[in-house]
Amino acid sequence: MAKVLVLYYSTWGHVETMAKAVAEGAKAAGAEVTLKRVPETMPEDTAKAIHAKTDQDAPVATPAELADYDAIIFGTPTRFGNMCGQMRNFLDQTGGLWAKGALIGKVGSVFASTGTQHGGQETTITSFHTTLFHHGMIVVGVPYSNPELTNMNEITGGTPYGATTLAGADGSRQPSANELAIARAQGKHVAGIAAKLAG
């Protein structure tokens, strides 16, 4: 049984919702799944001022524990076409793991949230991949065997690089059924590959 960590940061809850769907998909594939988030770096008064969702249930992860899993599926909101600062800060603390080669051969995957269709969802995921490659991880996306990726009946997130959702300019749009289906498919796909690699 593969051990899968779904590790995310979410300001307003969009990535949190996607993370739960990813975890559902991984569990459906028979994986032992852990859902955690990275620490908040935003000052508390700022978080309150922007109405950030601070009541998230997932426990906070530590960089050292990444080595305990066969696969890690990362979730991040987009910040100017890149991962958010909270996730970057967390990953910048994984130098010790890199020095030991602790993540070499583990499966890595990424999902994201953007404000709009053209808000940088693909660049966020592909630029995130650079860190995973430096750790020697096996990067996995979402195959086109999932029909939701080619859905042209609505405005929707979703890429072969990883699941995405569109939050809307004011954050009011929630992940759609189509986007959540892609997230579940990503979790299932990653868990299946991790199980095969784990033997």
UniProtKB/Swiss-Prot annotation:
Reaction it catalyzes: a quinone + NADH + H(+) = a quinol + NAD(+); a quinone + NADPH + H(+) = a quinol + NADP(+)
Similarity comment: Belongs to the WrbA family.
GO cellular component terms attached to this protein's record: membrane
Residue ranges the record marks as coiled coil: none
Cofactor(s) the record lists: FMN
Recorded GO MF terms: flavin adenine dinucleotide binding; FMN binding; NAD binding; NADH:ubiquinone reductase (non-electrogenic) activity; NADP binding; NADPH dehydrogenase (quinone) activity
Domain of life: Bacteria
Binding note for cofactor: Binds 1 FMN per monomer.
Signal peptide region: none
Residue span(s) of domain Flavodoxin-like: 4-190
Annotated NAD(+) binding sites: 12
List of residues binding substrate: 98
Database matches in PROSITE patterns: FLAVODOXIN_LIKE
Entry EC number(s): 1.6.5.2
Protein's recorded name: NAD(P)H dehydrogenase (quinone)
Residues that hold FMN according to the record: 10-15, 78-80, 113-119, 134
PANTHER family cross-referenced by the UniProt entry: FLAVODOXIN-RELATED PROTEIN WRBA-RELATED, FLAVOPROTEIN-LIKE PROTEIN YCP4-RELATED
InterPro entries associated with the record: Flavodoxin/NO_synth, Flavoprotein-like_sf, Flavoprotein_WrbA-like, FMN_Rdtase-like_dom, NQO
Pfam families: FMN_red
Keyword list, A-Z: Flavoprotein, FMN, NAD, NADP, Nucleotide-binding, Oxidoreductase
